[in-house]
């Protein structure tokens, strides 16, 4: 009897232990299934919401009343700018009042706050430049932008920094000044050459004893033998020297006639001076 009494609590404990483990396992399994289901539904819901917001963000008509002053407009100086923003493509379409055009510009970055915009405007202001020709291929634009612009010609709006504009103007000005300076240099050289020629001394006064000036006198008494000029000793009619060259060949001798009996031909040049220069040199005037 004692043995049975001692064994009874042990058996009862052993039967209770597996039941507790089974309950814990069932609870954990149910919690795991519920968590997986929640994660699945949460992922599906987030994906659906993301797709909906992406569709709604494209081509939202945003009309903003902005008080602006438009030149060459109607009697009223107030107008309304209407914009259509395509966030997916990063393009904004703009319509100005009184303008029969539709402008598109790229969204380089998100809009700045008022403080940042003020600082940005102080650092470097942007100037928008319109393209000269309208857009030819508009296939990349969204249907909302095409519907917004309708049949109006579409032009690109490009931002240009004021510093870049000043730099481009200065480069054009420098190029113009450089070309003008290059054109002025030949004229300046011609003027300086003419002034130097005018300032150059005209030479010594008339000297009747100088052979150079004797032919300029009324009598012209100095006469030279024409054979001096014929033999190449001096030039009777020249006022400046000149170089006279001739070909000198040495005869070979032998059977072959001229020009095969000559070899070693070389040019020999002489400086022919005016005969009046020689006469002036003899007289000691030169």
Swiss-Prot record:
Alphabetically ordered keywords of this record: Chondrogenesis, Cleavage on pair of basic residues, Developmental protein, Differentiation, Disulfide bond, Extracellular matrix, Glycoprotein, Membrane, Secreted, Transmembrane, Transmembrane helix
Transmembrane residue ranges: 29-49
GO cellular component labels: endomembrane system; extracellular region; membrane
Intrachain S-S bonds: 102-149, 234-238, 235-275, 245-269, 249-265
One Gene Ontology biological process: negative regulation of endothelial cell proliferation
Main function: Bifunctional growth regulator. May contribute to the rapid growth of cartilage and vascular invasion prior to the replacement of cartilage by bone during endochondral bone development. Plays a role as antiangiogenic factor in cardiac valves to suppress neovascularization.
Annotated source species: Danio rerio
Family: Belongs to the chondromodulin-1 family.
Propeptide residue interval(s): 166-169
Region of interest (Disordered), residue spans: 166-220
InterPro entries: BRICHOS_dom (IPR007084), Chondromodulin/Tenomodulin (IPR043405)
UniProt entry tagged with the keyword Membrane: yes
BRICHOS domain segment(s): 75-157
Name the UniProt record assigns to this protein: Leukocyte cell-derived chemotaxin 1
Segments of skewed composition (Basic residues): 166-176
Glycosylation (residues): 191
One Pfam family of this chain: BRICHOS
């Amino acid at each position: 009897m004692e043995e049975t009494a001692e064994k009874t609590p042990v058996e009862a404990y052993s039967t209770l232990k597996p039941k507790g483990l089974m309950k814990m396992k069932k609870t954990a399994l149910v919690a795991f299934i519920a968590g997986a289901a929640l994660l699945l539904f949460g992922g599906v819901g987030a994906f659906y919401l993301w797709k909906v917001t992406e569709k709604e963000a494209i081509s939202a008509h945003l009309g903003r009343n902005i008080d602006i002053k438009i030149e060459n407009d109607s009697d009223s100086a107030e107008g309304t700018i209407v914009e259509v923003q395509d966030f997916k493509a990063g393009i904004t379409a703009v319509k100005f009042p009184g303008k029969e055009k539709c402008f598109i510009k790229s969204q380089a970055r998100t809009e700045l706050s008022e403080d940042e915009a003020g600082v940005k405007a102080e650092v470097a202001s942007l100037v928008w430049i319109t393209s000269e020709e309208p857009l030819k291929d508009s296939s990349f634009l969204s249907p909302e932008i095409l519907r917004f612009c309708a049949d109006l010609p579409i032009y690109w709006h490009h931002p240009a920094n004021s510093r870049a504009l000043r730099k481009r103007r200065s480069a054009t000005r420098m190029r113009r000044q450089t070309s003008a300076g290059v054109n002025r240099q030949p004229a300046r050289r011609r003027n300086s050459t003419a002034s130097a020629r005018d300032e150059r001394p005209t030479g010594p006064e008339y000297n009747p004893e100088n052979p150079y000036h004797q032919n300029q006198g009324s009598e012209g008494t100095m006469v030279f033998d024409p054979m001096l000029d014929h033999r190449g000793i001096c030039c009777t009619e020249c006022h400046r020297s000149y170089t006279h060259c001739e070909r000198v060949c040495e005869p070979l001798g032998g059977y072959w006639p001229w020009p095969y009996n000559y070899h070693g031909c070389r040019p020999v040049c002489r400086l022919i001076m005016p005969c009046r220069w020689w006469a002036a040199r003899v007289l000691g005037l030169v």
